[in-house]
Amino acid sequence: KWNTFYLLLVVVLAIVILKTSCMEDQKQDEATLKSKAVLENISERKSVRKYLSKSVEEDKIDAMLKAGMAAPSGMDRRPWEFVVVTDRVALDSMAAKLPYAKMLTSVPLAIVVCGDTTLSSYWYLDCSAATQNILLAAEALGLGAVWTAAYPYEDRIDVVRQNTGLPENIVPLCVIPIGYPDGPQKAKDKFDSKRVHRNTY
């Protein structure tokens, strides 16, 4: 009787241990896959300058904006503002006047990343982090994007202001043309071990 009881107890314990081990292995595998996907997305990001005329779905636009707002922010002030521009006249006008944003003529939309100077004096740092998040989200969603600067060039800032109606305290950091890439494009391998220094330069 007791032998049967102990035998059953051993079997139950073995099952519990095996199940726990399998669950831990599964969690480890999921963590590995997640980290691999994140790192691959970072390394595969590229600046896209040629686009299809295909429109971008609203849920993807929302996903990019959420990614932007998930960026780190000094003292959690979150000084960013985002203007989603789909107006054809505005896109073409900015394309004509911004020297490195000519591709705006072929994209369905652009996101203008701006900073509120009344919330933070280092808004441009927080907004740069938000911009990178948007670029990475675009890559993950199968979209193309490129960072085109407005700040700190006063003439470019004025162009963006004229086309987006920004108040004086809101400064555009950059204009991000976004759309579906026109054909495959390969990311550059930018890693350079000569730029890495340990403890001292």
Locate the predicted segments by residue.
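Acidic, surface-exposed loops and disordered segments
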Residues: K1-Y201
